[in-house]
Regions:
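Active-site helix-to-loop segments that bind/position phosphate- or nucleotide-bearing substrates
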Residues: 1-17, 28, 34, 88-342
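A surface-exposed, charged beta-strand/loop segment in the N-terminal or early-internal portion
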Residues: 39, 47-120
Length: 342
């Protein structure tokens, strides 16, 4: 399997255009980068980046997605080619999306995957903690998440299930900053998860990485021939890629671990953020490039998958899971099984 690479264009006023079978990046009429199109799975542009019309056509023809984000990483638009995939699969997805029992079963497993993987983050932290009080706090957090896992089968509807998920998230984020090195906690303290806009540095970093992960999950869903708008856990709303968000849940723990690593290694520091009027905190400058490089490197790390005989790069795991979900929608498998961290 080949890992589909994503090109991130972050330099303001860049111009990207088609040069035969190559994408060329220019800044002030100077060529900065050439990338053969067959090496690319997606192109993501931050802020004021110009894209030539011939390149747009070629990306659409070659099935390479073009994603436009604002300068702070918020999603703006996405260009895709013709819709691919089996229409019968999408019909099945739409029909099963209206089946309360089926939707609840898929949503429950998405939440179970998320909670279980987040619990593994806390358990690992507890084992590695040097301070007994911190190890105990992380162990209690892991125990709370284990209680949520035991309660999930009792959820009789999506609202109850979402309530369990919300409480688990609250317990998880309450313990998460304990995994930061002590010298970074004052700068990266958080009072739970907040967004739109993020109100502290760690939430700003989490939001940035979650945006990258969501784009990859949406690409995986679309590559499998599924409709990204029709989800099971996340309610259907205009403009929301509900199914991509469903798929993303089981991978959030990977994003969280990357964020913790960036802070603990000093790759991202307190001065890499700016506070805007109204209290919004945003990742700025070269730190975004640091995060993008680290994210791309993490995507190339090989992980085992219980259903495959060979290691899989993390960047391909959303594609594997999207295809497993498609098999469930076709009726080839009894239930959707999320990817679980070992």
């Amino acid at each position: 399997m080949q890992l589909l690479n994503t090109l991130y264009v972050t330099t303001p006023e860049s111009y990207i255009h088609l040069d035969n079978d190559t994408l060329r990046v220019e800044v002030e009429k100077t060529t900065r980068l050439r990338v053969p199109l067959h090496h690319l799975g997606a192109v993501v542009c931050f802020g004021y980046v110009s894209v030539s019309l011939p390149l747009m056509h070629r990306l659409a023809d070659d099935g390479i997605s073009l994603v436009l984000l604002d300068s702070h990483g918020r999603f703006k638009a996405r260009l895709e080619g013709a819709v691919s995939g089996n229409v019968l699969l999408r019909q099945a997805q739409h029909g099963l999306g209206r089946d309360p029992a089926f939707a609840l079963a898929v949503a429950r497993n998405c939440v179970a995957g998320k909670v279980r993987n987040c619990r593994q983050v806390l358990l690992r932290g507890s084992r590695e903690a040097k301070v007994p009080e911190e190890a105990e706090l992380l162990s209690r957090g892991a125990a709370d998440l284990a209680a949520t896992l035991r309660a999930l089968p009792t959820a009789a509807d999506l609202d109850t299930l979402r309530g369990f998920e919300g409480e688990a998230a609250r317990q998880y984020f309450a313990a998460l900053t304990t995994l930061l090195r002590a010298s970074a906690r004052a700068s990266f303290r958080m009072d739970g998860r907040n967004r739109r806009p993020p109100r502290d540095r760690i939430n700003a970093l989490l939001s940035f990485v979650y945006t990258l992960l969501m784009n990859d999950c949406r690409s995986a869903v679309e590559a499998a021939g599924l409709d990204p708008q029709i989800g099971f856990l996340h309610a259907v709303r205009p403009g929301r890629a509900a199914l991509a968000l469903d798929l993303m849940e089981e991978f959030r723990a990977f994003a969280d671990r990357l964020v913790l690593s960036l802070i603990n290694r000093g790759q991202v520091g307190a001065n890499d953020f700016v506070e805007r009027e109204g209290g919004a905190v945003l990742l700025e400058g070269d730190a975004r490039k640091t995060v993008l490089v680290a994210y791309q490197e993490r995507k190339q790390e090989n992980l085992s998958h219980p259903l495959l005989s060979e290691p899989v790069p993390f960047g391909l795991l959303p594609h594997v899971q999207a295809r497993l979900l498609a098999r469930t929608l076709r009726g080839d498998t009894a239930e959707y099984l999320p990817y679980l961290v070992r």
